[in-house]
Structures are given as structure tokens and as C-alpha cells.
């Protein structure tokens, strides 16, 4: 059996500190790298007319002018290939079906649509279900429904992707107050304001 002395252990502990100091003392200049991705998202800048697959678009004004409770109401009435199932009895938690592929809040149902808000995937990590009531439909600036399977949109994008962008101070440079009432005592009040500072 080999016995390790205290000085050997001390040298083994202290030696990485000297290496780190030497590495930290050197300055390295790295060139910038630009990465481009060919998706139909307007934030990236590729025109929708140049995309080689079906893309349906809607603006926030079109969505808000449509009678209904949620964004699903607009989609079923205005976008081709979209149907809605009310499986949970909640108008804010609908199962959206696009060409046979679902985006549903129910765990266990097969999913095939990827949902993005401002480039952040809204499908839950393990079940891929979508909690539609967490998406603020009043804050949507524009929306694109992209058909077909595309690996650019991530795992489980079998039938398509729904990409939404929300308002910002640059796109919504005003203030607005909105009040809605409906059946069964439903009341909704919204106040929104946006703008960009000159500073």
C-alpha cells in the first residue's frame, strides 16, 4: 500500500491555481460570428413570400376584431385547415387541430404542433401539451401558422408551428383601455401603454 505525503496533496491542490493565473493573464481576441436561420419568423427578416411552404399570417388587429373569447376562435374562423375541439369545457383551454396534428392542454393526447411566443417554445417540456391560457392574446402583435414538418422549429414539429410575436414599445406606441363583458358574468378589463423613450 502506497502512502501519499501531505506535501504531495498540497502541491496537487495548489498547482491548478497557478495554471489558472497564467491562463487568465493572456488576452485572446475572438472574431465575431453571425448565425442566420431560414425561418418564417419576421424577427429574423426572411420575407414570407420566399418561404417554400404554406404560411398563414394574422395581425393583432385582425385577431382582436374577430368575435370570440380566445385566439383559437380567430384561428378556426380564418385559417385554413384548423379545427377546434372543446374537450375540457374551458373556452381558454381548447384543443387546436391543424391538418390532423394537435396542440392541446390535455396530457396524454398526441401532440404535433409547436407553439412559440417571441421565439420561446410554449409546449411543456415532457408532455408537449400547451397551456393556452398562459398566452396573452391581447398582447399579440402578429402570428404565423407554418405548415409541415420542419426541424428548425424543434422536436415534435410534425404538422406545423404556430409562431406569435407580442407587442413592444416600438410596435405599440400608444395607450388603450378596453372593457369586455359576456355571458355568465364574464368581465374583462385591459389597460395597455407603450412607447420608446428618447433617452
Could you describe each region identified by the protein language model?
Residues 24-64:
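Short, acidic, small-residue-rich periplasmic hinge/interaction motif at the N-terminus
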Residues 26-28, 77, 81-95, 155-158:
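Short, glycine-/polar-rich solvent-exposed loops and beta-turns at beta-strand/coil boundaries
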Residues 55, 63, 75-76, 142-145, ...:
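Non-catalytic regulatory/gating segments with a bias toward low-complexity or hydrophobic composition
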Residues 88, 93-147:
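Periplasmic plug
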Residues 94, 111, 160, 173, ...:
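Hydrophobic, lipid-facing positions within transmembrane beta-strands of outer-membrane proteins
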Residues 97, 163, 192-194:
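Outer-membrane beta-barrel architecture
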Residues 122, 133-178:
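A beta-strand signature from Gram-negative outer-membrane beta-barrel systems
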Residues 156-158, 180, 185-189:
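Residues that define the transmembrane beta-barrel architecture of outer-membrane proteins
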Amino acid at each position: 500500500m502506497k502512502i501519499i505525503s501531505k506535501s504531495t496533496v498540497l502541491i496537487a491542490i495548489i498547482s491548478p491555481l497557478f495554471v489558472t493565473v497564467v491562463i487568465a493573464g493572456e488576452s485572446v481576441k475572438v472574431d465575431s460570428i453571425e448565425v442566420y436561420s431560414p425561418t418564417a419568423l419576421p424577427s429574423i427578416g426572411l420575407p414570407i413570400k420566399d418561404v417554400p411552404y404554406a404560411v398563414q399570417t394574422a395581425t393583432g388587429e385582425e385577431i382582436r376584431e374577430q368575435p370570440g373569447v380566445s385566439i383559437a376562435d380567430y384561428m378556426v374562423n380564418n385559417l385554413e385547415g384548423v379545427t377546434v375541439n372543446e374537450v375540457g369545457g374551458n373556452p381558454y383551454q381548447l384543443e387546436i387541430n391543424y391538418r390532423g396534428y394537435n396542440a392541446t392542454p390535455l396530457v396524454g393526447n398526441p401532440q404535433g404542433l409547436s407553439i412559440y411566443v417571441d421565439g420561446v417554445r410554449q409546449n411543456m417540456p415532457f408532455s408537449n401539451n400547451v397551456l393556452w391560457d398562459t398566452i396573452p392574446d391581447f398582447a399579440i402583435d402578429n402570428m404565423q401558422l407554418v405548415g409541415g414538418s420542419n426541424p428548425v422549429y424543434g422536436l415534435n414539429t410534425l404538422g406545423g408551428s404556430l409562431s406569435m410575436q407580442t407587442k413592444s414599445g416600438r410596435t405599440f406606441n400608444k395607450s388603450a383601455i378596453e372593457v369586455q363583458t359576456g355571458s355568465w358574468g364574464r368581465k374583462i378589463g385591459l389597460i395597455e401603454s407603450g412607447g420608446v423613450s428618447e433617452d
